[in-house]
């Protein structure tokens, strides 16, 4: 199989293959054009992987262009975070970063060209009146009383707009197309509006700003984009995209192709809703590990490789569909199962004393990965007092319980076989200490007399245990499609974050931020950005097994 055969295929790649085969294009040039008004989320990751991935596979180019035409909502903070996210995902844009604002002078001249051709006019209807005049899907729109202005009058009024001669909302530039069009987007769409706001790139040079539909197609053309890829909600906008380029003097005419957006269950993708979660302090910022933002996923412990794999698995189609959270989790679980070093952590600790073990410590050797000897080993201190997880002990249990039971044996991971002899309880009847004996001949081997010990549990030596805050993250919402609810905040999962105070083994003392580990028998975790030498904090990335099938049945 050659490299081309190994590439993922989809309808967009088939179009590109045909364009190259017929000579329509000699090379491929795509772009990723986010608006810098928020943090990127997993849906943007799909677009990033598509646009940059196509450029890579076809030895082409992909631009990063900020669609910065609304200075009121934009911020340099978002520009910086978006660049970081793209690079973290493993991609690099061609040349310098582009901005739609780079083209404001040309866009203004193209607007004048449309006015000169009688294809644009200055309208003084209010925004509400424009909506009323636009009509509905069943009723055609009505012409604005300002639609018949002369070219000369429109040129003068447009210049007045630019010079700040109108208040915000008192005038706009509209395309003159067809108020009876069956496509509402073609009913004289607004091309320019007035905003007295300082722009992060152009300062106070402009008080009129072009609309997305006017800016987007011209920016594509000026950058010689061959294939302009966007999500399905822009399907009708393609008519306006082509109309603008057909009616101005510009040599390049890119084509727009639409694909389905990513809808992930148990979360929301709307920037407005995500912003509400942040501003109402329901989450801890845009990078809260429960957020679907790339920065949130990164903080939770997702790797760039797992997100790229997820985007490849879900594919590119024209049909909208909901993707199960299990699909995303399967990608990170597969990645970390293969690559994450193992460690031991006790999340709900109970003290265990091995009465027949001498004082002091014994240094044991544990593999960093059971199937990858090349990942080496680590030293794990063992002593007569250890922590085990409270759920790993019962005074009485049936045969299905393969952990420690009073009067029975279990193996300690990478250590010895122990037997529970007795327990100590507090006044409330809560077990405070489990007293055991151990078989010193069973270090990583079966008992000499042939008796079978089936269960294995993890542990941490108390004298060497490091206190850690363990953050158990779950889905943020309790219903699969919270965005469809009348009040999406009413569906917040109250157990989306459970904090435990536990202990981790000594080797994790210097765990690097975002470094992934498998806490044996517990799941995959990473050190949080709030983790310090004095207070370790670990985030659960994902459990060891898929819990979504069970959740789906319950739902």
From Swiss-Prot:
Intervals of motif 'HIGH' region: 34-44
Database matches in InterPro entries: aa-tRNA-synth_I_CS (IPR001412), Gln-tRNA-synth (IPR004514), Gln/Glu-tRNA_Ligase (IPR050132), Gln_tRNA_ligase_bac (IPR022861), Glu/Gln-tRNA-synth (IPR000924), Glu/Gln-tRNA-synth_Ib_cat-dom (IPR020058), Glu/Gln-tRNA-synth_Ib_codon-bd (IPR020059), Glu_tRNA_lig_a-bdl (IPR020061)
Localization per Swiss-Prot or TrEMBL: Cytoplasm
Principal subcellular localisation of the protein: cytoplasm
Listed GO biological process terms: glutaminyl-tRNA aminoacylation; glutamyl-tRNA aminoacylation
Cellular component terms (Gene Ontology): cytosol
Residues where L-glutamine binds: 67, 212
Keyword Secreted: no
Stored PROSITE patterns: AA_TRNA_LIGASE_I (PS00178)
Enzyme kind, highest EC tier: ligase
UniProt KW keywords: Aminoacyl-tRNA synthetase, ATP-binding, Cytoplasm, Ligase, Nucleotide-binding, Protein biosynthesis
EC number: 6.1.1.18
Residues reported to bind ATP: 35-37, 41-47, 231, 261-262, 269-271
Coiled-coil ranges per UniProt: none
Reaction catalysed by this enzyme: tRNA(Gln) + L-glutamine + ATP = L-glutaminyl-tRNA(Gln) + AMP + diphosphate
HAMAP family xrefs: Gln_tRNA_synth
Subunit structure: Monomer.
Entry protein name: Glutamine--tRNA ligase
Naturally occurring in which organism (per UniProt): Proteus mirabilis (strain HI4320)
Gene name linked to the record: glnS
